[in-house]
Amino acid sequence: MPSGRGDDADSTGNALRRLPHVRKRIGKRKHLDIYRRLLRVFPSFVALNRLLGGLFPPELQKYRRRLFIEVRLSRRIPDCVLVFLPPDSGSRGIVYCYVIEFKTTYSDADDQSVRWHATHSLQYAEGLRQLKGALVDFDFLRLPRGGGQVWSVVPSLVFFQQKADRPSFYRAFRSGRFDLCTDSVLDYLGRRQDESVAHLLAATRRRLLRTARGKRAALPRARASAVAGGRGGDNARRGLARGRAHGPGAQTVSASGAQGSGSQGADLLRGSRRARVRGGGAVEPAVRARRRTVAADAATTTVSSAFFVPRDRRGRSFCRPTRSL
C-alpha cells in the first residue's frame, strides 16, 4: 500500500497540471523575464537583493558571486543557484549557496495564502519537495573523506505575482552543510545548465555588453558635426594654399581635372613635335589646315550666336548676316 506522502505529492502534481494552459504559458514567460532581470542586476549586490525581496544578508555584499540558471541535477532542476564565494580567492571560508525556486501566481502570495489558498498552497508544497531533492543532490557531491571547503546550502522559495516586478513572498529554510570541492562543484553546475536557456541568457548578456559599450563610446551629434566641419575647413584651407603656391593668377581646380588636362596638352604637344620631326615638315600643311578649320568653326559659332538668321526647310538662309564695322 503506498504511503500517504507519495499520494500527497501525486495529488499536488496532478492538481497543478490541471491549471489552464494560458496560466502555464504566462508562468514560463515570467520565469524567463526573471532570468533576464537577474542577469541585468547581477553586477550590483544591492539591486540583486532588492529584486529578490531582501533574501540575502548584508554580510554577503563583499563576497564574490556566481549565477547558474536551471541546473539539471540528478533529481531536480532548480530555477536558480546563487553561489557566494569568500572575498579572498585563497580563503577557506564558508561558501554560501542559495538554491532558489521561483513560483509565479495570479494574485499576491503571503504567509497566509501559502497555507489556505488552493493554488498557493500547492505551489508551496511542490517547491518544498523540489528543494528537498536538490539538497539530496548536493549530498551526493560530498567528499567522502573530507578535506574540502564547507558549503552552506540554503533552500529558498520566492513567489512573484505575474505582473509585478518584485516578489510578494519569499522564505529561506534551514541550511544544510556539506564538505565539497569548490572548483569541481562550480564546474559541475556550469556544465549542467539548460542549453536553450543558457543560449538565451548569453544573447541577453551580449546585448547588455554592446549597450554598455555603445553608451561609453557614443559621441554627441553636435560635437561630431563640429569635428567634421573642422576637418572639412582644414581640407579647404589646404586646397587654397596649394592654389596660391602656383602663382597669383592660378585657379583652384580638382587634382584629377588638372592632371587630365595637363597630360592631354602634353600628349598633343609631343605628338605634333614628333610628327614634325619625323615627317621632315611634310605634316605641317595638314596641321595648318586643321587650325584654319577650327578657327572657321569658331567664327561661325560666334556669328550665329550674335545674329538670328532665318532659314527655309532645306536649311538655306534668306539673308546674309551683315558684318559689324
Curated annotation (Swiss-Prot):
One of its GO terms (biological process) is symbiont-mediated arrest of host cell cycle during G2/M transition. It comes from the Viruses. Belongs to the herpesviridae UL24 family. May participate in nuclear egress of viral particles. Plays a role in the dispersal of several host nucleolar proteins including NCL/nucleolin and NPM1. Since deletion of host NCL/nucleolin negatively impact on nuclear egress, UL76 supposedly acts on this process through its effect on host nucleoli. Induces cell cycle arrest in host cells at the G2/M phase following by apoptosis. The mechanism involves the inhibition of host mitotic complex cyclinB/CDK1. The keyword Ligase does not apply. It is found in: Virion; Host nucleus; Host nucleus, Host nucleolus. This is Protein UL76. Keywords: Host G2/M cell cycle arrest by virus, Host nucleus, Host-virus interaction, Late protein, Modulation of host cell cycle by virus, Virion. Pfam families: Herpes_UL24. Residues 222-284 are annotated as: Disordered. GO terms for cellular component: host cell nucleolus; virion component. Induction: Expressed late in the infection cycle. Residues 247-258 have a biased composition (Low complexity). The gene is UL76.
